[in-house]
């Protein structure tokens, strides 16, 4: 439901708790023109309805979605979360996450450690977690 997700928002999308892992509502920032273009396509495709075509059941559409993500190189659906977290980390911290080939925690300056922590807390919230420790799964240490 792209209309619900973007209603009244210019710089983010709102995800219903029922759409999300862990049942937590999320607000995800829109940070690029590419994201805006994808959202425009989603609006055009779904209109005021769902991204799942009316003639398809959720289970059927999920298998189509899984195949599409596999084709683009995301071996599992969770891989999309990893990719998002790593890209978002680089944009917030100013350097790559360890899991993406960036420096490990022991290699960071004090200023970089502070940027690392702020970025991890932001990403943790965006992914629906409440603590920095969970970001190690997505970003490495």
Positions of predicted regions on the chain:
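Extended hydrophobic-aromatic, low-complexity segments
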Residues: 78, 97-98, 135
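Extended amphipathic secondary-structure runs
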Residues: 62, 66-70, 74, 120-141
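Conserved tyrosine-mediated DNA breakage-rejoining catalytic core shared by Y-recombinases
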Residues: 1-41
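Active-site/catalytic core of tyrosine-dependent DNA strand-transfer enzymes
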Residues: 31-94
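C-terminal catalytic core of tyrosine-transesterase DNA break-rejoin enzymes
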Residues: 83-129
């Amino acid at each position: 439901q792209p209309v619900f997700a973007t209603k009244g928002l210019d710089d983010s999308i709102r995800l219903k708790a029922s759409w999300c892992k862990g049942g937590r509502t999320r607000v995800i920032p829109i940070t690029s023109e590419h994201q805006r273009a994808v959202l425009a396509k989603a609006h055009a495709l779904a209109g005021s309805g769902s991204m799942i075509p009316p003639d398809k059941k959720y289970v059927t559409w999920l298998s189509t979605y899984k195949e599409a993500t596999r084709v683009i190189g995301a071996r599992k659906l969770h891989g999309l979360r990893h990719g998002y977290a790593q890209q978002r980390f680089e944009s917030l911290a100013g350097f790559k996450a360890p899991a993406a080939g960036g420096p490990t925690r022991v290699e960071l300056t004090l200023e970089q450690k502070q940027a690392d922590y702020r970025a991890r807390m932001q990403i943790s919230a965006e992914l629906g977690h409440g603590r920095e420790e969970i970001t190690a799964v997505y970003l490495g240490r």
